[in-house]
């Protein structure tokens, strides 16, 4: 069940959903807007001949931060990691989906490539996978609205929520845009 604005506010007021910093004006009819932080992870395309999700490649990305009040420029065809300004914390019986903002999508900005789902129990900044599909560069201003979180009520609490010992939960508590840790639990079935 998708939560309405009334239900979102009630979950935040009860302390079950934490959004820090919280701005009540960001609550929409069935979502809550999130803003862009000021840190970006850009890919160092010359460090490796290819990306291998089975292998740790620590120099694949590096963190950059725009100076002062400057924007980050995302060029056509470019892909970078960023994160929400807000820290998001979910209880064991709510999951979330990060969706892009329609107005930004109409400019060619993709907010997340594939990983828009946030498990119950997650706590941290949400990493964004930003791509520019437009033919012109896009200015990304730290603090601008970048997406919206939709909250979903589970039929029951997760038995093993994100952050529990059963799962490695390698992104729990992440700060800023976090590089892929796919090598930590890489699985391949012989076919």
From Swiss-Prot:
EC number of this enzyme: 3.5.4.30
GO molecular function, one term: dCTP deaminase (dUMP-forming) activity
Pfam families (UniProt xref): DCD (PF22769)
UniProt record, GO biological process: dUMP biosynthetic process; dUTP biosynthetic process; nucleobase-containing small molecule interconversion
Chain positions of site Important for bifunctional activity: 116-117
Catalytic residue list: 129
Chain positions recorded as dCTP binding sites: 101-106, 119, 127-129, 148, 162, 174
Pathways per UniProt: Pyrimidine metabolism; dUMP biosynthesis; dUMP from dCTP: step 1/1
Biased segments, Polar residues type: 171-191
Sorted UniProt keywords: Hydrolase, Nucleotide metabolism, Nucleotide-binding
Region (Disordered) location: 169-191
Top-rank taxon, per record: Bacteria
Catalytic activity: dCTP + 2 H2O = dUMP + NH4(+) + diphosphate
Record family assignment: Belongs to the dCTP deaminase family.
Described function: Bifunctional enzyme that catalyzes both the deamination of dCTP to dUTP and the hydrolysis of dUTP to dUMP without releasing the toxic dUTP intermediate.
Subunit and interaction comment: Homotrimer.
PANTHER family: DCTP DEAMINASE (PTHR42680:SF3)
Protein name (database record): dCTP deaminase, dUMP-forming
Organism: Streptomyces griseus subsp. griseus (strain JCM 4626 / CBS 651.72 / NBRC 13350 / KCC S-0626 / ISP 5235)
Lineage, uppermost ranks: Bacteria, Bacillati, Actinomycetota, Actinomycetes, Kitasatosporales
């Amino acid at each position: 069940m998708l939560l309405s604005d009334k239900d979102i506010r009630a979950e935040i007021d009860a302390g079950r959903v934490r959004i820090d910093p919280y701005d009540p004006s960001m609550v929409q009819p069935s979502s809550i807007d999130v803003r862009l932080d000021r840190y970006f992870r850009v890919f160092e395309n010359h460090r490796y001949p290819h990306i291998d999700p089975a292998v740790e490649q620590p120099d694949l990305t590096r963190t950059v931060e725009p100076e002062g009040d400057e924007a980050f420029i995302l060029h056509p065809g470019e892909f970078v990691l960023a994160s929400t300004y807000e820290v998001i914390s979910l209880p064991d019986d709510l999951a979330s989906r990060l969706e892009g903002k329609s107005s930004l999508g109409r400019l060619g900005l993709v907010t997340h490539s594939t990983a828009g789902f946030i498990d119950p129990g997650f706590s941290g900044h949400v990493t964004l996978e930003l791509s520019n599909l437009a033919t012109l560069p896009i200015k990304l201003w730290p603090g601008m609205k970048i997406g919206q979180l939709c909250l979903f009520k589970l039929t029951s609490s997760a038995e093993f929520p994100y952050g529990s010992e059963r799962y490695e939960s390698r992104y729990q508590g992440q700060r800023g845009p976090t590089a892929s840790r796919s090598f930590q639990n890489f699985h391949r079935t012989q076919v």
